[in-house]
Amino acid sequence: MRKNKVKQMMAEGKPVVNGWLQIPSTVSAEVMAHQGWDSLTVDMQHGLVDYTNALPMLQTISSTDVTPLARVNWNEPGQIMKILDAGCYGIICPMVSNKEEAERFVQACMYPPRGYRSFGPVRGLIYGGADYADHANDEILKLAMVETKESLDKLDEIMSTDGVDGIYIGPADLSLAIGEKPGFDRPEDTKAYSEILRILEHAKKNNIFAGIHNGTPEYAQKMIDKGFNFVTIGADQRAMSAGAKAIVEKMKGSISKKESETY
């Protein structure tokens, strides 16, 4: 089976730089896949992507060396199995609050006897290889999102669940769960920032990977320096918006300067 580059990198102590796809387009997925990301996550929760969009996006990503991942919209076994069968090499699962939910998530990702995933990886066999069934349980990356109030009280039971490779922090939902305003790149004087560091320490103690969503490269680097293995920066639509805005503002400023010089 094709090796999971993301798992290999993190096991070797190398941080993974992950991109985020919210636009349901193979064109934007292709553009992103050629920018040097280690992995790209198709966002099926808050993005505009459904399964019919996700499949061709995964195919597009798979034409490069970038590892294809997906965030599902809920801890629902049928959806998890279906996107894995489509050739996804890792799942980020939202709103995992306790051990029971963690077990439900990881077991949907694994074939018996470790899980209850049904066998039928139509595209997984094409992308992963003929021996997919022999190695998929270990190669598929399984990241549980800890972002609810309950999960903050049950970190160790979630992180010690057999099959959980790591956790992923969504700072916006985490902030809301503890009564603060949502957003990325939490300031150091917020409770959310303290919780992020506490979650990271529990991940280290349980010897699992830790990932987090960031708003800027500078904050992502700060999180890597703290010990995070996996960092996401923004999303495709944010990158497009920021790039376009910078171009327009520079051009408008140049035009205004020229006009003022004529008077």
Which residue ranges define each predicted feature?
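Expand to "…catalyze enediolate/carbanion chemistry for C-C bond making/breaking, isomerization
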Residues: 1-263
